[in-house]
Amino acid sequence: MPGNSRRRGAVRKSGTNKGTTVGSGGQRRRALEGRGPTPPAYLRPNHPAAKRNQSSPHRPVKRTDETETVLGRNPVLECLRAGVPATALYVALGTEVDKRLTESVMRAADVGVAILEVPRTYLDRITNNHLHQGIALQVPPYHYVHSDDLLAAATDSPPALLVALDNISDPRNLGAIVRSVAAFSGHGILIPQRRSASVTAVAWRTSAGAAARIPVARATNLTRALKVWADQGLRVIGLDHDGDTALDDLDGTDPLAVVVGSEGKGLSRLVRHSCDEVVSIPMAGQVESLNASVAVGVVLAEIARQRRL
């Protein structure tokens, strides 16, 4: 009989809709929602331009001073929660989805940030093969506050607790110190404008996103800035392995500015002379000194303990 597809030898032509009982139900339409602007051709996985991009030599992507890339699920999410302005959110194809990634995508979409799903090889390239956990956020350069504003914010919620860095050149140390300051209720960090680590993607990553909450200021002259803080009532405490005051004897309840130098060089001469006292951390065994970020964490933890009493 005509139209009887069950008769012997009957073959249905492919591509016909006859016999279909389930429609798309709007699935195609929903799949296109919330993905942001269409990415360029070289970012579309199935486009010939993308295949050429993947097969090209993996050279580091040229970076400019106009943007910075924050890597990792916690740092990216903290940036978006803090309202840090961003221009693009990159998510690697095939990345395992968790609550942090889901919230990051939703927050980015809510504020109009372009969400680009890219090959993992491309994300490796723009991050110079640093650990990114399948997600990266492109942001403007870090916004440093003025040291006077840092002091004002600290005195608004006494007792003030600020940290200054002298000769710290490793951004991982800076990021770890930012994280400790956030963990122990510090108000901010002061770094020299020259010959110092700055808030880069590496520092963002090490801080686990705390850089979005802790203000950082730059000083053209660290010694002069410390003197201003001292004149405003802060007690300036230096950290050094040969300090004349043991941490056990430190009164951490006063408004404080804690100054730390590098593990190798320690505090510079002028900065050391700017301190009201220099504190050492009692240690057992043959260990002479601690990494700068570890030393800051130990001292801030002791100050926080005293302030809770």
Swiss-Prot record:
It comes from the Bacteria. Its EC number is 2.1.1.-. InterPro entries: Alpha/beta_knot_MTases (IPR029028), Ribosomal_eL30-like_sf (IPR029064), rRNA_MeTrfase_TrmH (IPR004441), SpoU_MeTrfase (IPR001537), SpoU_subst-bd (IPR013123), tRNA_m1G_MTases_N (IPR029026). Pfam families: SpoU_methylase, SpoU_sub_bind. One of its GO terms (biological process) is RNA processing. GO terms for cellular component: cytosol. Keywords: Methyltransferase, S-adenosyl-L-methionine, Transferase. S-adenosyl-L-methionine binds at residues 261, 281, 290. Residues 1-69 are annotated as: Disordered. Disulfide bonds: none annotated. Residues 1-11 have a biased composition (Basic residues). GO terms for molecular function: RNA binding; RNA methyltransferase activity. Belongs to the class IV-like SAM-binding methyltransferase superfamily. RNA methyltransferase TrmH family. This is Uncharacterized tRNA/rRNA methyltransferase ML0324. It comes from Mycobacterium leprae (strain TN).
